[in-house]
Amino acid sequence: MDNYLFNFCKNLETVWCKNQVDRIGIQTFGVTPMERLCVNAKNIDISAFAGMESLKEIHFRGGVEHMSLGAFAMLPSIETICLEGIDPDVMEDDWANLGNSNLTILVPEDTSDEQLEAIGRKFLSSMIITDGAQVKRGTCSMPEDPMPDIAEMLSAYGI
């Protein structure tokens, strides 16, 4: 997904991708009204989600090879970031200055203590969270969204 692909799309509520994408570029989802987002991408660029003022939860599926922590800048409503099997070594420290004491970072139950601490250090050093205890083991609760009925959507436009 190229840089600025959905940037400032004020009516964007849902994005559905069947398979993993190679990249989510700079401000791909910037300033959109989505409240929840599920990401399945290999690379996540800086400011990928910047300015999503309504975003409350974001879920990252496994397979992330590079993630700029600057992707989380300017997310005032964020409550949950779920990391499903992401190695802390693929996270690039970047200044996000979110400093959100109400944010929970969820990692899988089988995450080792060392990985848990490493993830906490990364999010702390990028000033996304205020306390390493905000990184917790748990289960993500975002269900899989079913594929939309494309024919039904097109019929609304007479196609």
Predicted features along the sequence, with ranges:
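Short, low-complexity, Pro/Ser/Thr/Gly-rich segments in the mature regions of secreted, periplasmic
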Residues: 151-158
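Small/polar residue-rich beta-strand/coil "junction" motifs that cap repeat-based extracellular fibers
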Residues: 94-96
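Terminal, low-complexity interaction segments
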Residues: 114-123
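Structural signature of tandem-repeat unit edges
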Residues: 3, 8-23, 32-45, 53-66, ...
